[in-house]
């Protein structure tokens, strides 16, 4: 029986890997090659080389980026760009909840369909469980909106159910894209009441050719969901329009990661930033359940005099994850990492910055699920003025935090410490 299950799972994984590779082959042809986007920054050329060789993620020196430090700032900008759409709208989110915020978005999408704009919506079958019914799928179809559910929840045992589509990507006309920590639900924009009082998150808006990578990522994931499209070349070329240069400052590298590429791209970027830091590293993450390699890199950076600061929630979102995370935080504090507990509510932002010159923003948490199991995306930013705004947001956020001490850990309820220690053994599964 065990051999049968193993063989069945291996066959399924091989099929999925093959689908991923075929989808990449058909979409990456529309994304610039390294010769067209050579980095003007030799000090980061090794990372640029790695990202292209490992995932076909090119450097863009002609695109601009805008940072949003909260959902309230993101939402009106996002809504306006949806209204401005002329050709197509692609939305890929882990969570879409049919609440007030989604209804506002849906009204615009309905209007754009009547104007001839192609609208596609892709969402995860577990994250968006309330929208994952066949009935809701049919409802969107009745509005003229194409939709797909990635890996709907089924009663049949399937290890692939653990590999969720955790990405947050929006593409408008192939010229503008968004990514970050925000999903499409009320709490992310602080609409009405939520159990955390305030939800702190972040996002970026990309304008220019760098959007091509996000367009390709969306189409790849679209093809992995049910009923993949057979013809790429003729139907997909229109989603990659020619775009004039928008910026001559710094560079952007949009990137992604998943459980099937066996490259650990997301973690390797974190390790790279930590290894190159000369003054400081600032991180925000809602969860902290990491492997020994990343834990050691954080501790080593602190031990060589780098000011390493980590902002995490003070309140639990998922109780067991919170308990396990506390054991990792204790280890980091013991070894010189500054841990800040966010007090006003829940921080869901995923930022990784260093020395005021490099930063990442995206959907990636510092936990096993994001780093090794899920489909994720991010944006690497280098030597752009927007990094100053990101750094300023982090410093302002620290003012709303309490720095964690070992005494704080000792004062935790016994049940939190016990569960954390017991289940830390199973951290890769949580």
Please place each PLM-identified region on the residue numbering.
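Cytochrome P450 I-helix active-site segment
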Residues: 143, 307, 311-318, 325-326, ...
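Thr-Gly-centered strand-to-loop micro-motif
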Residues: 284-285, 312, 342, 361-362
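Helical hairpin unit composed of two closely spaced alpha helices linked by a short loop
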Residues: 287-308, 313, 318
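Histidine/acidic-residue-rich catalytic or RNA/ligand-binding cores of hydrolases
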Residues: 293, 322-324, 354, 372
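Catalytic-core elements of nucleic-acid end-processing and repair enzymes
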Residues: 350
């Amino acid at each position: 029986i065990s051999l049968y299950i193993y063989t069945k799972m291996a066959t399924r994984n091989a099929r999925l890997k093959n689908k991923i590779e075929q989808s990449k082959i058909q979409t990456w042809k529309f994304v610039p090659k390294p010769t067209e986007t050579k980095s003007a920054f030799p000090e980061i050329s090794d990372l640029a080389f790695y990202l292209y060789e490992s995932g076909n993620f090119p450097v863009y020196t002609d695109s601009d980026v805008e940072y949003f430090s909260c959902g309230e700032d993101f939402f009106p900008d996002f809504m306006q760009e949806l209204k401005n759409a002329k050709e197509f709208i692609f939305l890929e989110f882990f969570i879409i909840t049919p609440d007030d915020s989604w209804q506002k978005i849906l009204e615009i999408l309905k209007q754009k369909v009547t104007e001839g704009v192609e609208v596609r919506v892709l969402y995860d079958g577990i994250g968006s469980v309330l929208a994952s019914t066949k009935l809701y799928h049919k409802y969107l179809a009745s509005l003229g909106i194409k939709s797909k559910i990635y890996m709907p929840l089924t009663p049949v045992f399937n290890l692939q159910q653990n590999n969720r589509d955790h990405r947050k990507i929006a593409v408008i006309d192939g010229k503008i894209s968004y990514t970050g920590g925000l999903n499409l639900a009320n709490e992310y924009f602080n609409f009405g009441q939520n159990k955390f009082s305030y939800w702190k998150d972040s996002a970026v808006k990309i304008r220019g050719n760098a959007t091509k990578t996000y367009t390709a990522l969306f189409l790849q994931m679209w093809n992995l969901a049910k009923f993949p499209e057979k013809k790429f070349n003729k139907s997909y070329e229109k989603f990659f329009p020619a775009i004039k240069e928008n910026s001559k400052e710094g560079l952007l590298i949009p990137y992604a990661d998943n459980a099937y590429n066996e490259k650990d791209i997301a973690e390797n970027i974190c390790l790279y930033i930590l290894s190159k830091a000369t003054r400081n590293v600032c991180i925000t993450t809602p969860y902290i359940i990491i492997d020994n390699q990343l834990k050691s890199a954080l501790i080593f950076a602190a031990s060589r005099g780098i000011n390493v600061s980590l902002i995490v929630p003070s309140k639990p979102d998922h109780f067991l994850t919170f308990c396990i995370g506390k054991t990792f935080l204790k280890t980091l504090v013991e070894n010189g990492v500054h841990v800040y507990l966010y007090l006003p509510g829940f921080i869901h932002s995923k930022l990784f910055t260093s020395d005021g010159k490099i930063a990442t923003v995206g959907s990636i948490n510092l936990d096993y699920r994001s780093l090794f199991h899920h489909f994720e995306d991010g944006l690497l930013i280098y030597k752009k003025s927007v990094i100053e705004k990101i750094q300023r947001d982090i410093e302002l956020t620290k003012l709303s935090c309490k720095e964690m001490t070992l005494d704080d850990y000792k004062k935790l309820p016994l049940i939190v410490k016990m569960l954390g220690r017991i289940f830390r053994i199973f951290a890769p599964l949580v």
